[in-house]
Amino acid sequence: MNVSHPAVHPVGVPPALGGHAVPPRMRMRVRMEYLVFQGMPLPGTLGGLVLRLGQFCSALIAFSVMLSVRDFSVTAFCYLVAATVLQCLWSLAMAVIDVYALLVKRSLRNPLLVSIFVVGDGVTATLTFAAACASAGVIVLIGNDIAMCKDNPCANYEAAIIMAFLSWFMVSISFILTFWLLATL
């Protein structure tokens, strides 16, 4: 009966540097933390607060412009209003948390808390992007294909869509950086 026998090879321990052995995983973690935390707009920092306020303001402007239009009965426009309201609420709540963290000088680098930020940013980014794309498609249909911009306030719709895309862009930056932070925790 031919059976292979496993060979056991001892694993060598790397030599200690200066009397202290630093495992390779810890050396990598230190390098990743250095790459992540150097001035990036993360939760609980001034840059993160500015990014959240930018998200909030652009979503609020998009919402306000859509409310100024008398009739937005198209489903995509209703979806844009709902998505911008959700984006406003999420960004405002995250801005309040950032202000709290800055005032009491607390770190928001708890893995559970950061994972909630990642999921919330991902969901709101997806919803805002979908709403902005759907509304942009309707505007292309109204403006270019059936030429009904004389009867509709296309400029207002376009301004709201631009602000929704700007809000999506800022929340996407927030999502990517927070996801990167989660990977290093």
Swiss-Prot record:
Keywords: Cell membrane, Membrane, Transmembrane, Transmembrane helix
Localization: Cell membrane
Principal localisation: membrane
Family of the protein in this entry: Belongs to the Casparian strip membrane proteins (CASP) family.
UniProt subunit comment: Homodimer and heterodimers.
PANTHER family reported in the protein's UniProt record: CASP-LIKE PROTEIN 5A1, CASP-LIKE PROTEIN 5B3
Identification of the protein by name: CASP-like protein 5A1
Organism: Picea sitchensis
